[in-house]
Each structure stands twice: as structure tokens, then as C-alpha cells.
A protein has these predicted regions:
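Selective transmembrane helix interface/packing segments
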Residues: 1-208
Length: 208
């Protein structure tokens, strides 16, 4: 992103690329710590193992197993929105400040690739959230609708629901300022993520 902004030979593009890089690096940390919660609860790094851990219906999904898991999901979802530059976290391409951000000077297929990559990123982070917190391809009803075809349906449904939530939040919330964006990450999400990991550890020791 920095190279895309720098190569445009435009100050607005360079500012947008630098903002985007700083934002992604910052929000990777709380997102990663939220995934650590999933790994601690499922005791595996395998995504297939994580989904298998959640079989048995909707109340076995990690998001509903304990309050710390719900907090981890919320933090991951907010961080994922920030990483994909979705409103209210679209500071790198704020029209009122940077014209169009790092893709100001791009048009045609180059702009289309930037545009498509943003939506592809939304689907990827939503798929990871569905796998880690919402049971992946597992049916919400124990013992029913668990065939491979139904698994594809459940996985796509959960992913599309999270994508819809991202788009809905874009329509609903105003854009944050740069200082507010960084304060949310370093002063709110990161401390809560660290405390949340300790909470999950204690929960696991007490309740198994």
C-alpha cells in the first residue's frame, strides 16, 4: 500500500498509503490476540480442528461458550473492519482529506483491482471469524443438516452475514479522525484484548 501510494507521485496518495500501513499494523495486534483466545479454547491451530471443537449445535460455538469469547469476537470484528479500511475506519481513503487515498491516481483495471481486493479482504476476514467463532460449516441444530452440501450453505451464510454487518456499519456510522482511530486501537482494544486472554486462561483452569 505504501508503494502504491508512493508510485503515484502524489502527496495525497502517499499520505493514504502511510495511513493504511499504520492502521493495518496497529489493528493486527488486537485481531491476533482475539484469535489466540480461539486457540486457547480449542487447543489446536488447525482450522478443521477448531470447527470440530464447535460441533453439537449453536450453543457449542466458541462465541457462546463463555463471555470472554464473545468479547474476543467483538474485538476481532472491529479490528477486521479497520484492517479492511471499512467505514468508520476508512481513514486511508477519506475523501474530505485525501481525495481518494492511495488509489487517487489509479483508474481502469488498476483501480478495479484495488476495489476488488477490499471486498475480497472482507470475505476472508469474515470467513476466518465464521470459522473461529461461529462454528464454521457446523449446523446450528445438533444432529441435523450436517451433510457436506449443508456445510457449504452454513459456511457461506455465516460469512455473508458478517459481510452484511460490515456494509451495514458503513451505512450507519460516521468516519473517525486519525487520532480517534489510533486511540481506539492502542488505548481500548489492545488493553481489553490482553485482559481478555488472562480471563480465558482463568476460565479454562476453573471450568476446563
Amino acid at each position: 500500500l505504501i508503494l502504491a501510494g508512493w508510485a503515484s507521485n502524489n502527496k495525497w496518495s502517499l499520505y493514504g498509503g502511510m495511513r493504511s500501513a499504520a492502521q493495518i499494523v496497529s489493528y493486527e495486534i488486537p485481531a491476533g490476540l482475539s484469535i489466540v483466545v480461539v486457540i486457547m479454547l480449542s487447543s489446536t491451530l488447525s482450522m478443521q480442528g477448531i470447527v470440530k471443537y464447535q460441533e453439537g449445535g449453536i450453543f457449542n460455538w466458541i462465541i457462546f461458550t463463555n463471555p470472554f469469547a464473545f468479547v474476543a469476537f467483538f474485538i476481532y470484528f472491529i479490528s477486521a473492519m479497520a484492517e479492511t479500511n471499512r467505514t468508520p475506519f476508512d481513514i486511508p481513503e477519506a475523501e474530505s482529506e485525501l481525495v481518494g487515498g492511495f488509489h487517487t491516481e489509479y483508474s481502469g483495471m488498476r483501480f478495479a483491482f484495488f476495489f476488488l481486493s477490499e471486498y475480497a479482504n472482507m470475505f476472508v476476514v469474515s470467513g476466518v471469524a465464521a470459522t473461529g467463532f461461529l462454528g464454521g460449516w457446523q449446523s446450528p441444530i445438533p444432529g441435523y443438516f450436517n451433510t457436506p452440501l449443508w456445510g457449504i450453505f452454513w459456511m457461506l451464510s455465516k460469512t455473508m452475514f458478517l459481510v452484511f454487518m460490515m456494509i451495514w456499519m458503513r451505512w450507519t456510522f460516521p468516519r473517525l479522525r486519525v487520532d480517534q482511530l489510533m486511540n481506539v486501537c492502542w488505548k481500548v482494544l489492545l488493553p481489553i484484548s490482553l485482559v481478555n486472554i488472562f480471563g480465558v486462561g482463568i476460565w479454562t483452569l476453573v471450568f476446563g
